[in-house]
Amino acid sequence: MTELTLRPWQAQAIQKAERWFLELGNKHFLVNAAPGAGKTICASVMAKRLIDKGEIERVIVIAPRREVVRQWGKDFSDVTGRHMTKVTGADGDVSDFGDDLCATWAAIQALSEPFQYICQNFRTLVICDEHHHAAIEAAWGEGAGGAFANAVFSIILTGTPIRSDGKETVWFAYDSDGKIDHPEEGTFTLSYGEAVDRGYCRPITFHRHEGHFTVTLPDGEGIAVSSQQKGQIDQRYNDIPGLQRALDFYKLACAPQYKPDGATPDPASFLGTMLDWGISKLDDIRDTTPTAGGLVIAPSIQIAEHMAELLEEMTGERPAIVHNQTPNAESRIASFRNNDTKKWLVSVAMISEGVDIPRLRILVYLPYAKTELAFRQCMGRVVRSLGADDFSRAYVVMPSLEVLEEHARRVEEEMSPQAREEPQHTFKVCPICEAQNPRGARECSECGHEFPEKATRYKTCPDCEMLNPITAAECQHCGAKFAADFEITLRDALRMGAIVRGMDLDEEDVADSEEMAEDFREFILASGDDFLVKIMRDVPLEAISKITKFAEARRRKSEE
């Protein structure tokens, strides 16, 4: 059991929760704290206090995905000295698996009966991590309502207390702004801006990556598209299927482009120039934080694979890549977390929430859905501070899309003016002995380590033709905004539409599909039904959650 020194906010939250539970006689306490502020430790200490006072006998933790469940087991054991058993829906009756259990939200429906038995027969605390997963229209949200109805207490944790879809969740309603509606006395809130000012989170800078696309039609005519300009289609092209859908700035921004050989990813494409900015910024950060890494969030497995190939083409190093078809994905995440020399990790939705990789500093953000909930979750992967000596900053590279810019502006407004200013470091840190050296030093003054030569990368302003650093958002000489021009064929534009298949998925659909993909695949293959196997090949795995929700809705309707 680890002896802990609590952060002031954690001590305040614990004191407030104890009063809410024990003096005022309430059941549900909400902790709304910025990603990386320390919610897991806070809730574990709350649980230990209640155990020590004899108020509870057992603890059940529900977390968003398996990797987060694993982290919960470790942190809970470190704080309480009690073992927490990780259980899945395949385990059946888990009521005698141990005093303290941890499962994913997706497992609740299969485990609702044993969880209900535990809550009815033992004084049980339920800790709900990332509470937005508990939408009552989702199967596990409905299961949670019944399974945990008799829990003595529940602690609800969230770093993003917003649901853009307005769905009601277990225990809490949402107000007209999509925010959790719960009494102030039963809530502890620590905003991202407050967490930055207190040193719990890093300040963040957003790079809006603009681009102008020209979609070339078969007759040679071009249609201009940008984030500020929708593609205008002449009537004579109305018979081209899917053309209007293809002329979407975000779809074009995500479209893979290749060199003339048709196989090599093109570094001069929109995706390539986004990565170029991230690569250059990560190289700068590694001068002062030699272990820093970058994360790419892609909208689909196909694009994640393309981004990985682009990174390898541009850096000479194959990045780590994880998605629901990756063998031993959790082991790969753990390997990246512990391998300080590996610079980049590419994922679809497996790193979007709860996964703690403290060395991440750069996020290249190309999500499938563009909700504020998903935005703040992914942002949370790069803002976790390492403590008082962590002077680094977090960066997000994203397409210049209005909805993403609105999310970014709200985050920036939470930060103090001082936190928004980007400091200029005059030193670099030796990766061997960690000594600080002048930025221009060729070798470490302490251990003699030779710093590798780093070529400064520039781009030319199209207006004044002067050179600027590759990461500059505007010309340092004439002030012109940088927005590269990209040509893309109609075939490639339509191909992107085929990749995403025009399906209306949100980030939670994608995340839930990631969680259930393995079980779904095993079920289909075990059925021996060739037709179902063919459907599984044709339907994107990101859509599994949508399909199961449809089936559940049909079942309910037939029972009415």
Where are the regions a protein language model picked out?
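Conserved pre-motif I regulatory segment
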Residues: M1-N32
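Walker A/P-loop
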Residues: L24-M46
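Conserved Walker A/P-loop ATP-binding site and its immediately adjacent core
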Residues: T40-C42, E55-D78, P299-Q302
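Inter-Walker segment of RecA-like/P-loop motor cores
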Residues: V79-E113
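SF2 helicase catalytic motif II
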Residues: Y117-I156, T160-I162
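Interdomain helical connector at the RecA1-RecA2 junction of SF1/SF2 helicase-like NTPases
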Residues: G166-T291
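Conserved helicase motor "Helicase C" RecA-like lobe of SF1/SF2 P-loop NTPases
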Residues: P299-H323
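Conserved RecA-like P-loop NTPase helicase motor core
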Residues: R318-P423
